[in-house]
Amino acid sequence: PFLGKDLKKSNLEKQNITFGYADRFDEKYDLVRSVRKGKYKYIRNYQPFNVDGIYNFYRYKMLAYKEWYSLFKEGKLNKIQSQFFLPRTPEALYDIEEDPHEINNLAKLKKHKETLLNLRETLNNHVVSQPDLSFFPEPYFLENGLENAVDFGQKNKKIIQSLVETANLNLYPYKDVSSEIKNALENENPWVRYWGLIVCSSFGIDAKEHLNKINSIFENDSENLVKIRAAEYLLLNNLKIDSSKINNLLKNAN
C-alpha cells in the first residue's frame, strides 16, 4: 500500500534506477545525493570536507563510536577502517555487487570513466529537474518556501540550477575553475556566494588565492549564513579568524 494507487509492482520491477537522498539527521547536516543503476552506485558529496563520522551528540555517547574514534585518533585503524573519519571525494562510484559495503571508490579509474560520467549526468539532471530545494539553506527555505514547497521550487527553478552549477565546480581541477569560483564569490545572489564558499572549502588551501575575498565576506556580507560559510573555510584551513566574531555569528544564527 505504501507504493500508492498509481504505481503497480510490475512497473516497479522494470525499474533499473534508484535515487538516494540525505540532508540532515538531528544536528548532523550534510548534502549527499546518489543514483544506482544496475550494479553501479554513484554518490555525489556536495560538501566533501565533511566526514561520514560527523558529530552527532547521541551517537558519540555510544561506547562503540567512542572506541572507534579513539582508535582512529591513536592511529590504530587500517586504511579501510579510517575512511569513516576522513574527508571524502566530491564523487564516488561503487560496484555494489563486488563491493556492497562501498569501500573501493572507482571514480578515478579510467576504465570506469564512461560509467561515472553517465551516472553523474543522470543524477545532475534529476537534481535540477525536481528541482532540489536543499540547495537553499534550510533556514531560508523554512522562512520562504515551507508553506508551498512545490510552488517555491518551480518559481526558483532557474536559481536552483545556478546553485547546482556553482556546487559542481568542485568536480573539476581547481586551476580550471578558479575564475568561476571568483565570479561566484562576487555574485549578487547570496546563495551563489554561499555555494562558492562551500566549493572553496572543498578545495581547501588550494583556494587560498581567494582569501581576501573570503575575509571580506566574513566581515561584511549581508547574509549571516554566508558569513558562516566563510568562517567555515577559515577554520577548516587553520587560518586566522577572530573568535569573538564567530560568537556573534552564532548568536545571530537563524
Where are these regions (language model features)?
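Active-site proximal loops enriched in glycine and acidic residues that flank catalytic Cys/His/Asp
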Residues: 21, 44-46, 131
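Generic structural hydrophobic/aromatic packing signal, biased to beta-strands
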Residues: 7, 19, 35, 42, ...
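C-terminal, low-complexity/hydrophilic appendages and adjacent surface loops
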Residues: 25-108, 115
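Short secondary-structure boundary segments
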Residues: 1-13, 56-74, 181-182, 215
